[in-house]
Structures are given as C-alpha cells and as structure tokens.
C-alpha cells in the first residue's frame, strides 16, 4: 500500500509539472533540428543574394523557433556577415507559404539598420 501511495504522488507531481506543447505555438529548435533551420536560412540567403539582395552569409545560429501558421514561420537569431565582411547579430523571420508565387517572406531586423523585408520563390 505504501508503494502505491508513493507511485500516486510521483505520478501526480509529474503530471502537475508537465508542460504540454501548445498546438500552433512557437517551439524552440534544438539539436539536430537546428540543421533544418540552418538549411532554410541558407537557402533564403542564396536566393536573395542572387536577386536584389541583401547579401549575407551565415556565420552561426544563436537561437531559433519554428511555428505552424498559414505555412511555417521560423524566427532565427543569427550572426551574419555582410558584403563588407562585417559580422552583425540579426533577428530573421522566414514565413514560408511555398504554394504561393514568391511565397517566402524574409525579414531582417539588424541593430542600427532599417528593417528589410524581401520575398522570393520556393
């Protein structure tokens, strides 16, 4: 009986402290899944550099979240190197709706610079 009581207390404590994932809420990207965020960002950087810019190269991703919206929305904080080899830490949002023409919208928000919003095809 004592063991059953202990098991019940442990179960209740586990359930009370569990944090269920909210459907549609942003989720932090970690570990191996960070590679996918890196690929998504590099693909957008390449497409934009081939067009009218901006021209950045990824140095490293500091943090990332992903969210299912009307498509997917990746919010990435990363160190980017510009065409003058200057490294800056920027917040980048990639909203992907690949079924639309030019359905990838990329927003760069870098300190001390105006926000840049560009679109490209999938």
Swiss-Prot record:
GO molecular function: cysteine-type endopeptidase inhibitor activity
InterPro entries, A to Z: Cystatin-like (IPR053128), Cystatin_dom (IPR000010), Cystatin_sf (IPR046350), Prot_inh_cystat_CS (IPR018073)
Motif residue range(s): Secondary area of contact: 67-71
Annotated positions for site Reactive site: 24
Keyword line: Protease inhibitor, Pyrrolidone carboxylic acid, Signal, Thiol protease inhibitor
Lineage top rank: taxon: Eukaryota
CDD domains: CY
Transmembrane segments: none
Residue list for modification Pyrrolidone carboxylic acid: 21
Signal sequence annotation: 1-20
Annotated SUPFAM superfamilies: Cystatin/monellin
Family: Belongs to the cystatin family.
Function recorded in the entry: Selectively inhibits the activity of cysteine proteinase of hemocytes, protecting developing adult tissue in pupae from attack by the proteinase.
The name this protein goes by in its record: Sarcocystatin-A
UniProt source species: Sarcophaga peregrina
């Amino acid at each position: 009986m004592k063991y059953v009581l202990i098991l019940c207390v442990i179960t209740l404590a586990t359930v009370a402290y569990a944090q269920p994932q909210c459907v549609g809420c942003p989720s932090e990207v970690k570990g191996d899944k960070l590679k996918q965020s890196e690929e998504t960002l590099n693909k957008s950087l390449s497409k934009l550099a081939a067009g009218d810019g901006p021209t950045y190269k990824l140095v490293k991703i500091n943090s990332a979240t992903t969210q299912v919206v009307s498509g997917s929305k990746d919010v990435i904080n990363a160190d980017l190197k510009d065409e003058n080899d200057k490294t800056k830490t920027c917040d980048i949002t990639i909203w992907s709706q690949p079924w639309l023409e030019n359905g990838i919208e990329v927003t760069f928000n870098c300190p001390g610079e105006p926000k840049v919003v560009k679109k490209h095809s999938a």
